[in-house]
From Swiss-Prot:
The keyword Cell membrane does not apply. The lineage of its organism: Viruses, Monodnaviria, Shotokuvirae, Cossaviricota, Quintoviricetes. It is found in: Host cytoplasm. It comes from Human parvovirus B19 (strain HV). The keyword Repressor does not apply. This is Host-modulation protein 11K.
Length: 94
């Protein structure tokens, strides 16, 4: 603590127990002696949330044999799968 006080006696300069941001009466030394009081430090930027990467589903080998298969709508792909299950797809190709 400094001995050359400007207009205040040393009793009023003692730590009053208030946090530094609240107290205007006493002059805290820069490292605040009170635990848990407000200190002046640059604000930490908030972390941006990065969603986890979505795993890309690899097409089956039977999906690859038809090159245009991935350009069809989901319903058309479903119909083709159902026809393959019924073993009718090979008959329709002939």
């Amino acid at each position: 603590m400094q001995n050359n006080t400007t207009g205040m006696d040393t009793k009023s300069l003692k730590n009053c127990g208030q946090p530094k941001a609240v107290c205007t009466h006493c002059k805290h030394s820069p490292p605040c002696p009170q635990p848990g009081c407000v200190t002046k430090r640059p604000p930490v930027p908030p972390r941006l949330y990065l969603p986890p990467p979505v795993p890309i589903r690899q097409p089956n080998t039977k999906d690859i044999d038809n090159v245009e298969f991935k350009y069809l709508t989901r319903y058309e792909q479903h119909v083709i799968r159902m026809l393959r299950l019924c073993n009718m797809y090979q008959n329709l190709e002939k």
